[in-house]
């Protein structure tokens, strides 16, 4: 039986759109997807879907918290019902804040744009079908989770971000990086917008391209999203760093 999932789109950016790419990254043969604006009344849809993915955003969970108060309430309601929910980048931070964690500026106080090497924690690699303990993942953020929700489990970290992936409860996962984005989208769209917005300077572009050399979206992280949505992993069964 096919399952229904919703991508909660948290962006109002008009210079590019990667909704279709994001859905395709996480879609399986037995799933149907719809894209829903995170700025609508989300409480009306909570029982219409089997799980949810929260997208990235140009907004801040701290500076724009009033704008997303409805999203935070929705996250708590979904979590209480133990429905699967995955947050990507801004979505990861929203998940953390809504469930009692804290988000702050990157430790470096600089915008992080490039790829980082993530190290899996608490045996996550075994649950996503890989023997590799490290993967490269695209990062594009000025803020990050600095305190996980109480009772959560750390699933991955990197040198730049202590909390790259975490889980709380049985089926809620936050991923700070962007497993959905292709190298092409990053180079053609994200790079252009970050240069226009001043998040990246021209003299940093060479470093960015060097980091991106040979990059492929990590299938292990995409599999983590799919397994979470389809309840193939119960994170409460993981024993580790809480």
From Swiss-Prot:
Highest taxon listed in the record's lineage: Bacteria
Any one annotated GO CC term: cytosol
InterPro entries, sorted: ChyE-like, Class_I_gatase-like, GATASE
Residue ranges of domain Glutamine amidotransferase type-1 in the record: 4-200
Enzyme Commission number, as recorded: 3.5.1.123
GO molecular function annotations of the record: hydrolase activity
Catalytic activity: N(5)-phenyl-L-glutamine + H2O = aniline + L-glutamate + H(+)
Keyword list, A-Z: Glutamine amidotransferase, Hydrolase, Plasmid
Active site: 89, 178, 180
PROSITE patterns: GATASE_TYPE_1
Enzyme class: hydrolase
Keyword hit for Hydrolase: yes
Inactivation phenotype: Deletion of atdA2 from atdA1 to atdA5 causes the accumulation of a considerable amount of gamma-GA from aniline in recombinant Pseudomonas cells and inhibits the growth of a recombinant Acinetobacter strain on aniline.
Role summary: Hydrolase that catalyzes the hydrolysis of gamma-glutamylanilide (gamma-GA) into aniline. May prevent the accumulation of gamma-GA, which is harmful to cells, during oxidation of aniline to catechol.
Matches recorded under PANTHER family: GLUTAMINE AMIDOTRANSFERASE YLR126C-RELATED (PTHR42695:SF5)
Protein name: Gamma-glutamylanilide hydrolase
């Amino acid at each position: 039986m096919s399952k229904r999932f919703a991508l909660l789109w948290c962006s109002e950016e008009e210079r590019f759109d990667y909704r279709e790419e994001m859905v395709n990254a996480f879609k399986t043969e037995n799933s149907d997807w719809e894209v829903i604006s995170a700025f609508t009344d989300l409480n009306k849809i909570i029982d219409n879907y089997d799980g949810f993915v929260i997208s990235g955003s140009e907004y801040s969970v701290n500076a724009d918290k009033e704008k997303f108060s409805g999203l935070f309430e929705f996250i708590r309601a979904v979590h209480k019902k133990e429905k699967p929910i995955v947050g990507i980048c801004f979505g990861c931070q929203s998940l953390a804040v809504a469930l009692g964690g804290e988000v702050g500026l990157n430790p470096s106080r600089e915008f992080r744009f490039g790829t980082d090497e993530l190290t899996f924690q608490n045996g996550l690699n075994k649950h996503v079908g890989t023997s590799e303990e490290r993967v490269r993942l695209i990062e594009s953020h000025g803020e990050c989770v600095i305190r996980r929700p109480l009772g959560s489990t750390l699933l991955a970290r990197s040198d730049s971000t202590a909390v790259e992936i975490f889980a709380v409860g049985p089926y809620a996962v936050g991923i700070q990086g962007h497993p959905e984005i292709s190298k092409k989208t990053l180079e053609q769209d994200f790079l252009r917008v970050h240069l226009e917005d001043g998040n990246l300077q021209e003299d940093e572009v060479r470093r960015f391209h060097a980091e991106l050399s040979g990059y492929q979206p990590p299938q292990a992280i995409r599999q983590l999203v799919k397994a979470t949505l389809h309840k193939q992993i119960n994170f409460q069964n993981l024993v580790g760093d809480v």
